[in-house]
Amino acid sequence: VLIIAVLFLTACQLTTAETSSRGKQKHRALRSTDKNSRMTKRCTPAGDACDATTECCILFCNLATKKCQVPTFP
């Protein structure tokens, strides 16, 4: 009896999830792009002000000058 109850509850959850996701496909796609835009960080170009929390574009933040700059290799 317990196995039958578990199978019944599992089937109910699957059909409920399938039914509710059909009408919300458009909204799910919108949420996905919103999430991606929040996850995308903007970077600071060379010469702009920066600090320890700033993400410089393919550069590094020179904390002495507080500006993003290209690394120089000896």
Swiss-Prot record:
Gene Ontology molecular functions: ion channel inhibitor activity; toxin activity
Protein species of origin: Conus abbreviatus (Abbreviated cone)
Propeptide residue intervals: 18-40
Entry's free-text remark on domains: The presence of a 'disulfide through disulfide knot' structurally defines this protein as a knottin.
Subcellular location: Secreted
Keywords, sorted A to Z: Cleavage on pair of basic residues, Disulfide bond, Knottin, Secreted, Signal, Toxin
Name recorded for this polypeptide: Conotoxin AbVII
Highest taxon, organism lineage: Eukaryota
GO cellular component, one term: extracellular region
